[in-house]
Amino acid sequence: ASLGTAFTSQHAGVLKRYTDQVILTYDSDGAGIKAALRAIPILRDAGISARVLNMKPYKDPDEFIKNMGADAFKERIAQAKNSFLFEIDVLKRNYQLEDPEQKTKFYQETAKKLLQFGEPLERDNYIQAVSREQMIKEEELRQLVNRLGMQMGLKAGDSYREDASGRNVISRENGSGP
């Protein structure tokens, strides 16, 4: 267990020795959400798949278990959300989707995040999942992702992401940078 603000790539390296999957159970408040958002890319870079546990309406695991019991907590663990889809849900909170302009910006940012998957099959799986959850036509989202990738100069198999300091990082299929 780590505190969210203290989670590092070294922690992820230790975890990787024991598992390829983790469930993040940070507090459900703003600080906990930020901690999860910081931990997700660190875990991803270490090759660890993460899911995020929804504690609501309670603040933390202790409060949840005291009020709902261990069986309910186990159910929540089984329902933990894929970390990328969690990131999209959090991103969505920044937009007023009733406004067409805001909705378009949300879809553009979502498409940009989908570019982090260089493997075409994985990217396609996430396009399908996001289109289902966010109620956007799959083909329209795919076209938006492809168009954005072309504008950024990505080739098939390349991936794009922002690093922890906000810099754009392009990973080429052969493992080299831009």
Regions found by a protein language model. Name each.
Residues 1-4:
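Short hydrophobic/aromatic-enriched beta-strand-loop microsegments
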Residues 6-178:
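A charged alpha-helical hairpin associated with nucleic-acid processing machineries
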